[in-house]
């Protein structure tokens, strides 16, 4: 498989991709600063990074930063709908192996995950950069299978295809994924769902290499998850449906950082926003922000637009969808497609209006509009978060890769956070672009509150 240098939609799109990448670089000061800081040191020289993260223009800037810092990279998207084909083409044109096409089948998706581990010449990856945990799960389950542990019964079509692909790799190159797992110095994980998977694996004692939780860096979760969703959610809904948000009733399921950004996004568009929550603290936050907190059973017949962002499963059920209004819009901005019971609609009549926009007709004649087949709407129906906020997230990713690759002996087979001083560094790198002038503590002031003059300024437990 390593013989194919790339799989993209159309390599001739590379020129268009390069133009957008050039513009994005101007909006991604953190990554560009790291290129300058580490230009001579090349701290990732010798790193072979298997990357599974949405293949967008912004990710192209991340990939080229990793390469500038000395790494070799093989890349796939972490979602079947999120690739921007011109971005993938631009990366392929730079002779960086990339396997990503917008609108992949599930078979293609898992084949591409397999390919990013296939370095050829007997080599393996020694680092993983992950978003959602699929690449990590691929190598961990491969090693389990090679150790004689059997898969549990698959619960859905995707699990069947995942298991089939891992089995194929194990049969083709016995011992390869065990060898890969032993070579991995660490994984940096981008998103809430992937981090949850890592903590579950670590709790069972089954994590085979160290991991850094990038998602819970303040400059990721409080910016990408919040401000990113605040801009990208309504962009996706409008591009997909041309709906006017003003005056509509929208329901946001979940009021974590993504839910907070999503609710603000819809409110800023003029919608009246309902919120559903299971956590009393988040529910109280939503209520005190002025949102009406209800159950989904109460929201189903009232709302015009539904957005899930819980990271959980079966949030919007078939019964909820049956109770919805004619032409209610249903979408998800959580990482996986488990939040909406899309499989329960399999026997309904589906009419594709345009890519990633489907009209689903119930037996009684009522129709709802499903976006991106329940997968990430902001990347399926639009282009995701703006470059600037992704610069903060991806600067964390690069720092995590450097930390794990260069300081491997500091880490056990567990999940870690980036230290506070690096979190503050990421923020500081983005201030000049916004014209921010930081105040500076005097030594007396620093002593008074018990912090160094140049930080870190907050304890690890501080809630921003």
From Swiss-Prot:
Residues binding substrate, per UniProt: 56, 131, 190, 220, 224
Listed SUPFAM superfamilies: Formate/glycerate dehydrogenase catalytic domain-like, NAD(P)-binding Rossmann-fold domains
Binding positions (NAD(+)): 191-193, 225, 254-259, 277, 312, 333-335, 378
Pathway the protein takes part in: Amino-acid biosynthesis; L-homocysteine biosynthesis; L-homocysteine from S-adenosyl-L-homocysteine: step 1/1
Cofactor annotation: NAD(+)
Keyword vocabulary terms for this entry: Cytoplasm, Hydrolase, NAD, One-carbon metabolism
Gene Ontology cellular component terms for the protein in this record: cytosol
Main location: cytoplasm
Pfam families xref list: AdoHcyase, AdoHcyase_NAD
Subcellular location(s) per record: Cytoplasm
Cofactor note: Binds 1 NAD(+) per subunit.
EC number in record: 3.13.2.1
GO annotation (BP), single: L-homocysteine biosynthetic process
Function field: May play a key role in the regulation of the intracellular concentration of adenosylhomocysteine.
UniProt-recorded name of the protein: Adenosylhomocysteinase
Protein's organism: Zymomonas mobilis subsp. mobilis (strain ATCC 31821 / ZM4 / CP4)
């Amino acid at each position: 498989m390593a013989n194919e240098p790339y799989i993209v939609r159309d390599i001739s799109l590379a020129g268009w991709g390069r133009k957008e990448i050039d513009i994005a670089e101007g909006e991604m000061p953190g990554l560009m600063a790291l290129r300058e800081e580490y230009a001579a040191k090349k701290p990732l020289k010798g790193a072979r990074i298997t990357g599974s993260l949405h293949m967008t223009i912004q990710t192209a800037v991340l990939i080229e930063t990793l390469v500038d810092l000395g790494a070799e990279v093989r890349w796939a998207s972490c979602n079947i709908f999120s690739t921007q084909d011109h971005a993938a083409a631009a990366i392929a044109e730079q002779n960086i192996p990339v396997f990503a096409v917008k609108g992949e089948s599930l078979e293609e998706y898992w084949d591409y995950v397999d390919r990013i581990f296939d370095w050829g010449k007997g080599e393996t990856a020694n680092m993983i950069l992950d978003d959602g945990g699929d690449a990590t799960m691929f190598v961990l389950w491969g090693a389990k299978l090679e150790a004689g542990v059997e898969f549990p019964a698959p619960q859905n079509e995707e699990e069947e295809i995942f298991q089939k692909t891992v089995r194929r790799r194990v049969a083709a190159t016995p011992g390869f994924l065990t060898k890969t797992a032993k070579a991995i110095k660490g994984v940096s994980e981008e998103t809430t769902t992937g981090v949850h998977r890592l903590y579950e694996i670590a709790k069972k004692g089954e994590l085979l290499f160290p991991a850094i939780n990038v998602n819970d860096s303040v400059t990721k979760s409080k910016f990408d998850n919040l401000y990113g969703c605040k801009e990208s959610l309504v962009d996706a809904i409008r591009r997909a449906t041309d709906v006017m948000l003003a005056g509509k009733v929208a329901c946001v399921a979940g009021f974590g950082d993504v839910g907070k950004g999503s609710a603000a996004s819809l409110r800023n568009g003029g919608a009246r926003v309902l919120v559903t929550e299971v956590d009393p603290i988040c529910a109280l936050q939503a209520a005190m922000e002025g949102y009406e907190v209800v159950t989904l059973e109460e929201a189903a017949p009232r709302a015009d637009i539904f957005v899930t962002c819980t990271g959980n499963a079966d949030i919007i059920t078939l019964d909820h969808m049956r109770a919805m209004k004619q032409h209610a819009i249903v979408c998800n901005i959580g990482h996986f497609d488990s939040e909406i019971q899309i499989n329960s609609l399999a026997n309904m009549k589906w009419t594709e209006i345009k890519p990633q926009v489907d009209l689903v007709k119930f037996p009684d004649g009522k129709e709802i509009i499903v976006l991106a087949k329940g997968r990430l709407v902001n990347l399926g129906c639009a282009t995701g978060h703006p470059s600037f906020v992704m610069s903060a997230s991806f600067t964390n990713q690069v720092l995590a890769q450097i930390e794990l690759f260069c300081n491997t002996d500091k880490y056990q087979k567990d999940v870690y956070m980036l230290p506070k001083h690096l979190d503050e560094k990421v923020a500081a790198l983005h201030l000049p672009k916004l014209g921010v002038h930081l105040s500076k503590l005097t030594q007396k002031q620093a002593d008074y509150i018990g912090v160094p003059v140049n930080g870190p300024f907050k304890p690890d437990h501080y809630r921003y």
